[in-house]
Amino acid sequence: MKLLHIDSSILGDNSASRQLSSQVTKAWQAAEPSAVVTYRDLAADAISHFSSTTLVAAGTTAELRNAAQQHEAELSATTLAEFITADAIVVAAPMYNFTVPTQLKAWIDRIAVAGQTFRYTEAGPEGLCGGKKVVIVSTAGGIHAGQASGVAHEDYLKLVFGFLGITDIEVVRAEGLAYGEEVRNNAMSAAQAKISEQLFAAA
């Protein structure tokens, strides 16, 4: 089994999403000792956003690309291959201004590729990544579940992965992390309990 672990928070060791995603990955490895983990830190090693260079590189043969275009082509190919070959993905997704971090959006733009992870048919778009499992580690300073704002970044990620054909999606959520120490501790404890008692209870 191949497990892809994605972090995207800019907070380093102070990040709740990083702490929880690490726990998910460790629990997964304990449940499946043969799992091979690929780790990508999108904050420390950011993926560049789409640009005209990215698009030109995709439509230019390798021998005709300049250095910048070749870099973009290799980055796209490596990022896509990591996703396609993964059996499961752990995505740490803190809420930044009601959506995902820009670093995570840049990664999504590299994996949502027509003809590779989805295709268009006469009946509409069809995801090509069925069979994968995704665990979204969702964190937020505020409390959004059940509120007018909703948990927008979770909904977005579910939409993206669903579009790619992935239906096995679990969410580990810790919110209200900026509401004081007691609320934060309770939220983290609840998320940790879900990881150990629900996601991997049978392990």
Curated annotation (Swiss-Prot):
A Pfam family: Flavodoxin_2
EC top class, as a word: oxidoreductase
Cofactor info, note text: Binds 1 FMN per subunit.
Keyword Ribosomal protein: no
EC nos: 1.6.5.-, 1.7.1.17
Binding positions for FMN per the UniProt entry: 9, 15-17, 95-98, 139-142
Cofactors (names): FMN
Family: Belongs to the azoreductase type 1 family.
Family annotation (PANTHER family): FMN-DEPENDENT NADH-AZOREDUCTASE 1 (PTHR43741), FMN-DEPENDENT NADH:QUINONE OXIDOREDUCTASE (PTHR43741:SF4)
Protein name: FMN-dependent NADH:quinone oxidoreductase 3
